[in-house]
Amino acid sequence: TVYGLNRIQATTDAYLGLPVDVLGTEHIVLGWPDLMGQLRSEFAVLATEDGTDVTYVPKAKTTSGTEIGVATTTTLNAGEALPVASLNGDLSGSVVTSTKPVAVFGGHECAFVPDDNTWACDHLVEQIPSTSTWGKEFLTVPLKTRSGGDTFRMIASEDATTVSVNGAAVATLDRGQVHQMSIDGKST
């Protein structure tokens, strides 16, 4: 098992690294909204093989000037990365496709979770599984020290996806749409 850690002064986040043999060719980014165009939503794509064509369609304008919904393709070789950051907005729901398996990481420079009323921000990073590995049922368990619940973001890979918590429908999402909520206690 690999545990990735990104630590800088006053902020840290970590993620479970996924092995190369489970990487895929389609990913939908999950990150966090930017804050006033200063603290950015971001993702990165890492190639595992030479000559990998990577296409992304962003859900927010990027710092490189790519407009919302405009497909951009670049070729990466093994070990090369394509970093993408929002100019403003949330890159969650951006679709990344590739001709060969890639690793995709979603996150944020320094997010205020659960909202802007939080007194300090933290860097966020998570390796995003390819859509071919996504499941339909998940269990949540609260962290013992949390007094107000844990924040969850759910994203759909298909149109008309119903999100249910403890058997009750809480949202209907189309591909790339996000539903965010706080959940108290253990849930399914």
PLM regions with names:
Residues 1-93, 97-188:
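Conserved functional hotspot residues at active sites or interaction interfaces
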